[in-house]
Amino acid sequence: MTYNQPNNNGFYGNFGGQFIPETLMTAVIELDEAYREAKADPSFHEELDALLKDYVGRETPLYFAKRLTDYIGGAKIYLKREDLNHTGAHKINNALGQVLLAKRMGKNKIIAETGAGQHGVATATAAALFDMECTIYMGEEDVKRQALNVFRMELLGAKVHSVTDGSRVLKDAVNAALRAWVTNIEDTHYVMGSALGPAPFPEIVRDFQSVIGREAKRQFATVSNGQLPDAVLACIGGGSNAIGLFYPFVNDESVAMYGAEASGLGLDTDKHAATFAKGRPGVLHGALMDVLQDEHGQIMEAFSISAGLDYPGVGPEHCYFNEIGRATYDSITDEEALESFKLLSRLEGIIPALESSHAIALTQKVAKELGADKSIIVCLSGRGDKDVAQVKERLKQEAKEGK
């Protein structure tokens, strides 16, 4: 059966949709119509492809991680090097696509939310390129954790708005950005950073990020005499790098799909972001998806060492994949992610983002299970420059405590 989601109402099975106030409906309908037109227009794709090639530096390599493979002693591990993109992560794929769409719609102002700051930097970069005014909403906690990325955004000409509501992290930044969009829909486009939000956002983000999986599929075929990998794997917060890798393989039933979510200090604590392990369906930021909530339906605070993964929900298409068993989602602790951060740095000379380190940690388990005659493609979603200072402090603290 050929996969054909979302349906015309923006649902992936029971997940997704448009759970938004009437005031936002006009903007969302306008966006949907503009996106359908752009999607059918070859000149839009030509302009985006040229930017991805000449400005972003695509295609990114598919790198056989021999030393990591030998160390684990299981499946051959290929890293899809999204860390080598301009701005250092996969986020630029989507930001450029959406800012190009905004230009086509005649919008001259851009707003976005950001957690780790990577989507904020990517959006500020695209806005600078197209000479658009840019405001980035970022939780106060994340502003502290990611001071370097805040400076980068400001250097690129963006205004960074520190959000002091709620738990002052990513979900609060999304709330603030949506509120700002409602009052400025005539001249402003909201660049959603992950495969979340009301339809058509999850589909738009998926389509712009699918360049990851399309390239990886083609590259793997080149090194394997036209074969498919046995598995593809990525970390998952909202889920955009994962959906970008997964989607081009969704009809290839022989290819297993694995997502690594963040279990923070452990599933037996309340300090985690393991939505599939501990969440249940609810509405958040305009879509029905699995979310972390208490017994009264209040959204709970997510926690992870990685600012890009501490979101209390997960994109509706991943929820659908989980429900129908097309993908398998497992959780990785802060400790496991830190070990993998160090491991990849030492074995391959590649310092991964803490988000991507969760994927590397799950890869160690999956590669062993698959065995030596199999192959796995792992999305290395971003580089670790932004995390080095945080990890240094963490390791210093652990040394002091004698861990």
UniProtKB/Swiss-Prot annotation:
Q: Name the Gene3D superfamilies for this protein.
A: 3.40.50.1100
Q: Superkingdom, according to UniProt?
A: Bacteria
List, alphabetically, the SUPFAM superfamilies matched: Tryptophan synthase beta subunit-like PLP-dependent enzymes (SSF53686)
Presence of keyword Ligase: no
In which pathway is this protein known to take part? Amino-acid biosynthesis; L-tryptophan biosynthesis; L-tryptophan from chorismate: step 5/5
What UniProt keywords are attached to this protein's entry? Amino-acid biosynthesis, Aromatic amino acid biosynthesis, Lyase, Pyridoxal phosphate, Tryptophan biosynthesis
For this chain, one GO molecular function annotation is: tryptophan synthase activity
List every position bearing N6-(pyridoxal phosphate)lysine. Answer: K91
The cofactor(s) it depends on are: pyridoxal 5'-phosphate
Catalytic function, reaction form? (1S,2R)-1-C-(indol-3-yl)glycerol 3-phosphate + L-serine = D-glyceraldehyde 3-phosphate + L-tryptophan + H2O
EC main group? lyase
EC number of the protein: 4.2.1.20
List, alphabetically, the GO terms of the cellular component aspect. cytoplasm
**NCBIfam families membership:** trpB (TIGR00263)
Task: Report quaternary structure and partners.
Answer: Tetramer of two alpha and two beta chains.
**General function of this protein:** The beta subunit is responsible for the synthesis of L-tryptophan from indole and L-serine.
Family stated for the protein in its record: Belongs to the TrpB family.
Q: What name goes with this protein?
A: Tryptophan synthase beta chain
Q: Can you name the source organism?
A: Streptococcus mutans serotype c (strain ATCC 700610 / UA159)
> What lineage, starting at the top, does this entry show?
Bacteria, Bacillati, Bacillota, Bacilli, Lactobacillales
